[in-house]
From Swiss-Prot:
Site feature (Transition state stabilizer) residues: H205
Signal sequence residues: none
Expression triggers: By auxin, sucrose, oryzalin and the nematodes Heterodera schachtii and Meloidogyne incognita in roots. Down-regulated by abscisic acid (ABA) and hydroxyurea.
Protein name: Phosphoglycerate mutase-like protein
Catalytic residues (UniProt): H22 (tele-phosphohistidine intermediate), E134 (proton donor/acceptor)
Task of the protein: May play a role in carbohydrates metabolism.
Naturally occurring in which organism (per UniProt): Arabidopsis thaliana (Mouse-ear cress)
Family listed: Belongs to the phosphoglycerate mutase family.
Annotated disulfide bonds: none
Region ranges (Disordered): 252-271
Length: 271
């Protein structure tokens, strides 16, 4: 029987990831008009535009309608203003009002947002990870500020695995190549397999996500290759399944498998 194009894998070797590109940032607007604006210090660690926040609100509505908040066990976010604002706006708790006894994910007006504080109440944990940052080099909009500054703006986000307070990864030149970003993407996916969570949201950037997706699907049909190669729009969400076809992860995660033979008895292999 021809099973070409079909894959069958044990569920405990699969994870679901929801890839999200950040909403519109001030650098996107400037760069659309003049690409050289990406090299301007005016857009250092760019924050979201008012339109970008509208996009976040719409994504938030979708996340709730699709009941993703009931499924997502962890939100991984690139440590940049625009990605963090997108992540907490889409996956965070309600507006932090009435003195709710929960550490805020975002304080009021963080990053010139003109938005109220966002609570961590009833939201999944958030983890900042440098591996999923945007293509590094040349563009100041892709250089992060200190972790100390971010912690003051986003108190409930876990920045503990970021090794240095200041940004030591971004260099003025050269800018990372697509091949380098793709390699970083593969490293990121391998790291995902060290996590116990089975369903994870990842809020990142166009260049990184394109590099990541371009690393996979080489053995797929042309339509699927094309689907993987399309750049994500601002605030777009794409859900994917990743499969451990080697032994990258562990079998410690919960599984729906059941061992059988409880209680033990005769076990005829013919039936």
């Amino acid at each position: 029987m021809d099973n070409e194009g079909i894959g069958l894998y044990p569920l405990h070797r699969c994870k679901t990831i929801h890839l999200v590109r950040h909403a519109q940032g001030i650098h996107n607007v400037a760069g659309e008009k003049d690409h050289s604006a990406y090299s301007s210090e005016d857009y250092f660690d760019a924050h979201l535009t008012p339109l970008g926040w509208q996009q976040v609100d719409n994504l938030r509505n979708h996340v709730r309608a699709a009941q993703l908040l009931n499924k997502v066990e962890l939100v991984i976010v690139s440590p940049m203003l625009r990605t963090i604002q997108t992540a907490v706006g889409a996956f965070g708790g309600e507006e932090d009002t009435n003195g709710a006894d929960a550490t805020p994910l975002m304080v009021a007006n963080a990053g010139s947002s003109d938005r109220p504080a966002i609570s961590s109440l009833n939201s999944p944990p958030f983890l900042a990870v440098e591996l999923c940052r945007e293509t590094m080099g040349d563009h100041p909009c892709d250089r992060r500020r200190s972790v100390t500054e971010y912690k003051a703006l986003f108190p409930a986000i876990d920045f503990s695995i970021i090794e240095t307070d200041n940004d030591v990864l971004w260099k003025p030149s050269p800018r990372e190549s697509l091949e380098e970003v793709a390699a970083r993407g593969v490293e990121f996916i391998k790291w995902i397999w060290t996590r116990k969570e089975k369903e994870i949201a990842i809020v990142s950037h166009s260049g990184f996500l394109h590099g990541l997706l371009s690393s996979f699907g080489k053995d797929c049909c042309d339509d699927l290759k094309k689907e993987l190669s399309i750049h994500l729009s601002n605030c777009e969400l794409r859900s994917m399944v990743i499969v451990d076809r080697g032994n990258l992860g562990t079998d410690s995660a919960e599984t729906t498998n059941y061992p059988g033979k409880v209680p033990e008895g005769l076990d005829n292999p013919s039936g």
